[in-house]
């Protein structure tokens, strides 16, 4: 395994083929206590890891095929592995990363939110959504669908978390108000997707058996603030088995509040994922309040980086805009947004309007239907492609901006924070 990513424990020189030492098992744990997992590594790295464990390197391919291709972690189902070492080998390469704590469903079972407890006691949430056949191709969180819409049962999208909490501090977002606990490992991200893919494949949600077709990095956390783990996870999600889960890169969306250097770096990765920029205001005065990182990278810098991403990848950029009543829904802001999207992104720009989802204690609400309709009309009249997001999961606090695990972690409640003050908006919104 490469330097910096090798298992930390040194193996005994006299390790036999089927006997794994305590050092090898200890080496499967990172310094922060998060277990190393097969999904953290490329297939070549997995081969070297297995060889260091004293097993033939092709065992890595076999276990990878089970995890990514057959969507199983159960050693009893891996009958091509020797019975004498099967459980121990699987236990080292596929340690449990997520434990379900609570599951809530709505939309007649077509939307499911799961609260996960991680190995160190941190919590994250993910949301699985099934859309009927011929549903609007942009409704699922702005993600693009495969040509067949996912399956004959309709597209299935997973909203995945990349961090426990979030450090961006956006005042209208429950996760942003919770604060950052830690980054997730690549495998912790991939595990959310693998569980969802298995759930859909086995028909364990409404609509019967199907295929997970889309993944959006729009759950808890700022994906590009956890850059290396997110990019590694995207590769595991999109590479074909036994390397990964085989979901099309074009069906993966990575969102960001606008970390300009990370956007520019993402453009060099050779990935064809959709970039979604959480803009929420066309002017720096208001965006400084709604998205505090704007003080570091203002609107034009963010859109400039998004334009370069679109130019390099030839992929459409989705501009995310949460409509907040009497805050950012004024007609002149619609006109300003349209002008900026046309200037920077042209035909590769798309605006995804999001009716603000309620969060506990927040004084803000969604725009009125009339204001929303006028905002849409002005964007469309200016020649900008625009859609209004389907607000799936509101009933279970699983919609955009609502994810924040309300649980105790290391002595503090993760969601219970004071409602944001409106004072800072008094001048900016006018």
UniProtKB/Swiss-Prot annotation:
Ligase recorded as keyword: no
GO cellular component: cytoplasm
Cofactor dependence: [4Fe-4S] cluster
Gene Ontology MF terms in the entry: 4 iron, 4 sulfur cluster binding; metal ion binding; rRNA (adenine(2503)-C2-)-methyltransferase activity; rRNA binding; tRNA (adenine(37)-C2)-methyltransferase activity; tRNA binding
Coiled coil spans: none
Enzyme class, UniProt record, top EC level: transferase
Chain positions recorded as [4Fe-4S] cluster binding sites: 166, 170, 173
GO biological process entries: rRNA base methylation; tRNA methylation
Domain Radical SAM core: residue ranges: 152-395
Annotated positions binding S-adenosyl-L-methionine: 221-222, 255, 278-280, 357
Intracellular or extracellular location(s): Cytoplasm
Active site positions: 125, 400
Entry function: Specifically methylates position 2 of adenine 2503 in 23S rRNA and position 2 of adenine 37 in tRNAs.
Protein name: Probable dual-specificity RNA methyltransferase RlmN
Species this chain originates from: Acidothermus cellulolyticus (strain ATCC 43068 / DSM 8971 / 11B)
């Amino acid at each position: 395994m490469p330097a910096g990513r090798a298992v930390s424990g040194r193996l005994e020189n006299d390790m036999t083929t089927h006997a794994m030492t305590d050092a090898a098992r200890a080496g499967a744990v990172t310094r922060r206590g998060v277990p190393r997992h097969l999904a953290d590594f490329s297939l070549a790295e997995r081969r070297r890891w297995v060889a260091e464990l004293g097993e033939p390197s092709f065992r890595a391919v076999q276990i990878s095929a089970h995890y990514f291709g057959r969507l199983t972690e159960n050693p009893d189902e891996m009958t091509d592995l020797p019975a004498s070492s099967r459980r121990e080998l699987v236990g080292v390469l596929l340690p449990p990363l997520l434990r379900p704590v609570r599951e809530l469903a709505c939309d007649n079972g077509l939307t499911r939110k799961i609260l996960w407890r991680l190995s160190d006691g941190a919590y994250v949430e993910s949301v699985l959504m099934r859309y009927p056949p011929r549903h609007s191709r942009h409704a699922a969180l702005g993600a693009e669908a495969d040509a067949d819409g996912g399956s004959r049962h309709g597209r299935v999208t997973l909203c995945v978390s990349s961090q426990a909490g979030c450090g961006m501090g956006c005042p209208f977002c429950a996760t942003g108000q919770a604060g950052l606990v830690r980054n997730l490992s690549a495998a912790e991200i991939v595990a959310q997707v693998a569980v969802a893919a298995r759930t859909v494949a086995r028909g364990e949600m409404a609509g019967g058996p199907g295929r997970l077709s889309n993944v959006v990095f729009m759950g808890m956390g700022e994906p590009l603030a956890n850059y290396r783990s997110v990019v590694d996870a995207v590769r595991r999600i999109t590479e074909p088995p036994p390397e990964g889960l085989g979901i099309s890169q074009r069906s993966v969306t990575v969102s960001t509040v606008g970390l300009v250097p990370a956007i520019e770096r993402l453009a060099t990765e050779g990935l064809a994922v959709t970039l979604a920029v959480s803009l929420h205001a066309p002017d720096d005065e208001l965006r400084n309040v709604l998205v505090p990182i704007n003080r570091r990278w203002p609107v034009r810098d963010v859109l400039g980086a998004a334009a370069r991403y679109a130019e390099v990848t030839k992929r459409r950029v989705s501009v995310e805009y949460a409509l907040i009543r009497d805050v950012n829904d004024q007609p002149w802001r619609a006109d300003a947004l349209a002008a900026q999207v046309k200037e920077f992104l042209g035909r590769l720009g798309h605006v995804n309007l999001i009716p603000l989802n309620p969060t506990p204690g927040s004084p803000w609400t969604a725009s009125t239907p009339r204001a929303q309709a006028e905002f849409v009309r002005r964007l469309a009249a200016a020649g900008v492609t625009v859609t209004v997001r389907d607000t799936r999961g509101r009933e279970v606090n699983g919609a955009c901006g609502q994810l924040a695990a309300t649980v105790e972690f290391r002595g503090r409640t993760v969601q219970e924070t004071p409602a944001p003050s409106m004072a800072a908006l008094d001048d900016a919104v006018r």
